[in-house]
Regions:
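N-terminal auxiliary segments of SAM/dcSAM-dependent transferases
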Residues: 44-150
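Conserved class I S-adenosyl-L-methionine
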Residues: 187-197
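Conserved SAM-binding loop of SAM-dependent methyltransferases across substrates and taxa
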Residues: 198-209
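Conserved SAM-binding motif I beta-strand of class I
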Residues: 211-216
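S-adenosyl-L-methionine
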Residues: 218-255
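A short glycine-rich, Lys/Arg-flanked "PGG" loop and its adjoining helix->strand segment in the class I
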Residues: 276-290
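Conserved beta-strand signature within the Rossmann-like core of class I S-adenosyl-L-methionine
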Residues: 291-298
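Class I S-adenosyl-L-methionine
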Residues: 302-344
Length: 344
């Protein structure tokens, strides 16, 4: 059973479907959240009544990176058709060149000049709506940060104010998420992702887990996930339940021994120190089942201007909180720990 705000829920596929997949825990939002005007992919609606949310699919948005733009330009040298992807590699389609414009899908088209511009920009992703080409980037007046999708060799990375939220040096976001999950395999039972981001770990965990709950505090990050084709299982997979809210406020409401695995990939210590606090670690220990595992990403020692070895500090704090078998994995820059007891 899962307890949230005093309500007892049987957390299984049927209840997940009733819940609609997305929960809102931000008290400032009472009826609906509308994304920034001018190119919104849709509206996530929810009500104060628990379980009153409606799962909505995003509107179809064509996304291109330098990879697809370069492919099309090369193929158009030999004819007026090109096979390419309009969703960052998920699927392929045939597009045609007519009178200096590439007809993509429906009313969407892009000029050759814009296609050449996209091909030269290797660190950005572009959305095409009818004849408009826009870089996928958002500025938040609340956090005063910019949010951007950045192309990689497989799944896009999230960049916040020029700081990458994914590892891409010597790896890719997908391979990195797969490597992390191998540290806590077998991935079974109930999984919690405390800081969802683009949701790659939650998506991969859902392949074998019974259920996955993912928490995301930043509505701008959630917007990036809704735009990202490779994040769509978050909104479509009935095994995955999303909560829009603050993990430090939500997790205390969970019952004891609720989860088999907890993935904790918080922002930097300077941004979210509360997610590294002793009290928060104690709550993570409490909600894990005996033998359950914690996967805590810390990053490389000294990275992003750090003067401390964060992984060593986290290792000490987790041991002090009562975790067992606490150790650091140098390949993924994660600390792995377990709640004492036997895993069922």
């Amino acid at each position: 059973m899962l307890r949230i705000q005093g309500r007892r829920l049987k957390w299984n596929l049927t209840q997940n479907e009733k819940m609609g997949g997305i929960r809102n825990r931000d008290p400032r939002v009472t009826s609906e959240l509308r994304w920034q005007p001018g190119g919104s992919p849709g509206v996530i609606r929810w009500t104060e009544r628990f379980g009153g949310t409606v799962r909505k699919r995003r509107n179809s948005v064509i996304l291109l990176s330098s990879t697809q733009a370069s492919e099309m330009l090369n193929q158009f040298q030999h004819g007026n058709q090109s096979r390419t992807s309009l969703d960052l590699g998920k699927t392929e389609t045939v597009v045609s060149l007519q009178e200096g414009y590439v007809r993509l899908s429906g009313e969407a088209q892009v000029s050759l000049d814009n296609l050449r511009m996209i091909a030269k920009c290797e660190d950005a992703i572009f959305a095409v709506r009818e004849c408009r080409v826009e870089k996928v980037i958002r500025f938040s007046n609340t956090s005063l940060r910019t949010y951007k999708l950045r192309p990689t060799a497989d799944w896009p990375a999230l960049e916040i104010s020029s700081i990458l939220m994914h590892r891409i040096k010597g790896t890719t976001p997908r391979r990195d998420a797969e490597a992390k999950l191998r540290l806590v395999s077998p991935v079974q039972g109930a999984v919690l992702d405390t800081c969802m981001g683009l949701g790659y770990t939650a998506i991969l965990a859902a392949f074998t887990a019974d259920s996955v709950m993912a928490i995301e505090k930043d509505e701008n990050v959630l917007e990036m996930a809704r735009l990202n084709p490779h994040s769509q299982p978050l909104f479509q997979d009935r095994k995955i339940t999303l909560i829009h809210g603050d993990a430090t406020q939500i997790i205390p409401d969970f019952g004891n021994a609720t989860f088999d695995i907890v993935n904790h990939d918080p922002p930097t210590l300077s941004i979210a120190g509360e997610l590294y606090a002793d009290a928060f670690y104690a709550d993570l220990l409490r909600i894990l089942k005996p033998g359950g595992k914690l996967l805590h990403y810390t990053g490389a020692p000294g990275s992003r201007g750090r003067r401390i070895d964060l992984s060593a500090s986290v290792t000490r704090r987790l041991a002090r909180a009562g975790f067992a078998n606490v150790h650091n994995d140098s390949e993924t820059f994660c600390v792995v720990a377990a709640r004492p007891g036997r895993r069922r």
